[in-house]
Each structure stands twice: as structure tokens, then as C-alpha cells.
């Protein structure tokens, strides 16, 4: 991994090469299907044939855009992480927003995942397969988790300083609890089919911050 730097959203980011040229429509569709398959089945449980069947294209077309499955998975993770990072930048850009409002916007993607019972966070899904993932993928998944916990820490500190939150523990510890609870709630909902799981977890977390 490259040297870390701080982004505008308060996350630590890797130094990367200049962004690649825009992908073709076919490449984006391949990434869309691969992302959905990872979120619903897991990385090891899908193949290029599954994507080819879904898009009604030949496997050779997929290999043209992504030579190996590792290349594809890395591209999926990078695109997913970039979208999240842009969302976090948009949240922190509004300095007039309360810290609770920022957290409520943060959990919106999780609520969207929960609306599709068999779907979880991409990096949450991949974390269950860490030993089998290529090193580059493992590093990216770990980075996603760490950077989101750091972002949450900064929002919690902001809320405590402004009197929005009453933290019983350090902001860093609460951030770990918050992030872990969201990820865990999605996995438990998928396992049990309990559609209230995430909603109840978010409600409890918000109540703890207001005490």
C-alpha cells in the first residue's frame, strides 16, 4: 500500500496513481453484477460464468475488461470505497448540520442494504473470507474498516465538543461499537430474516449517544 494521507473527509487515504480513464458501459455493468454477487453470495461463490449469464455476454468479454478475478474484485472494492468516500465528503461538507444528522446520513446506505435482506456491506461480506482473499484485496478491506472507524471517531468528537452527544467512553471506542454494530446487524438480519434488526440497532446507538 502507498503512503497514507488525510483526505478532505477526515479519512486516512492511500496515495494512489492518477485515476484511470472512464470505464466502458460494459465494464461498469460487469462491476455492478460482481458487486451484487459478492454482497449476496460471497467472493468465492461466484464465477465469470455467473456474470456472463446475468449480462448475456461471453466470458471472453469479461476477461477483456478484467483479466483475472483478482483484478475484478480489486476494481469492485475500489469503486465501492470511492463511492463511500465521496458520500462521507458530502456529509462533512455541511458544517451547519448537527453531528447526529451526519450519523443519520452515514447509516443510510446500511438501511438500503437492509431493504434487500440477502445483501450486506461489500467489505463486510469480504471480511468473512479474508484468509482466501489476495493480499491486495485484504489490505483494501482492512483499510475500509479502519478509515470508516476513524471518520466516525471524528464525528463523535465533533458531537461531544458541540454538546450533541454525551459519550460514556472515548470517541474511538464508541466509533468501533457503532461500526461493528452496523456491520453485525446486517449479517444477523441476513441470517435470521429479522427485518427489524438494523432499525433496532440504530435506534439503540442513537439513544446511547443522547444519554
Regions found by a protein language model. Give the residues of each.
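Amphipathic C-terminal alpha-helical segment
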Residues: 113-116, 154, 158, 178-196, ...
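Helix-turn-helix
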Residues: 2, 26-29, 33-71, 75
Amino acid at each position: 500500500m502507498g503512503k497514507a494521507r488525510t483526505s478532505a473527509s477526515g479519512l486516512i487515504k492511500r496515495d494512489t496513481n492518477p485515476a484511470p480513464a472512464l470505464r466502458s458501459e460494459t465494464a461498469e455493468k460487469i462491476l455492478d453484477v460482481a458487486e451484487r454477487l459478492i454482497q449476496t453470495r460471497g467472493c468465492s461463490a461466484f464465477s465469470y460464468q455467473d456474470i456472463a449469464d446475468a449480462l448475456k455476454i461471453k466470458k471472453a468479454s469479461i476477461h477483456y475488461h478484467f483479466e483475472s478475478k483478482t483484478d475484478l474484485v480489486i476494481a469492485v472494492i475500489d469503486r465501492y470505497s470511492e463511492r463511500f468516500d465521496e458520500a462521507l465528503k458530502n456529509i462533512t461538507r455541511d458544517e451547519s448540520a448537527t453531528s447526529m444528522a451526519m450519523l443519520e446520513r452515514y447509516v443510510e446506505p446500511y438501511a438500503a442494504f437492509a431493504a434487500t435482506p440477502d445483501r450486506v456491506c461489500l467489505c463486510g461480506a469480504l471480511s468473512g473470507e479474508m484468509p482466501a482473499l489476495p493480499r491486495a484485496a485484504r489490505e483494501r478491506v482492512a483499510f475500509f474498516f479502519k478509515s470508516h472507524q476513524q471518520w466516525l471517531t471524528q464525528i463523535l468528537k465533533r458531537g461531544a465538543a458541540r454538546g450533541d452527544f454525551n459519550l460514556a467512553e472515548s470517541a474511538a471506542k464508541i466509533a468501533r461499537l457503532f461500526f461493528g454494530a452496523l456491520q453485525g446487524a446486517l449479517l444477523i438480519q441476513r441470517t435470521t430474516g429479522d427485518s427489524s434488526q438494523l432499525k433496532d440497532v440504530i435506534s439503540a446507538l442513537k439513544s446511547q449517544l443522547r444519554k
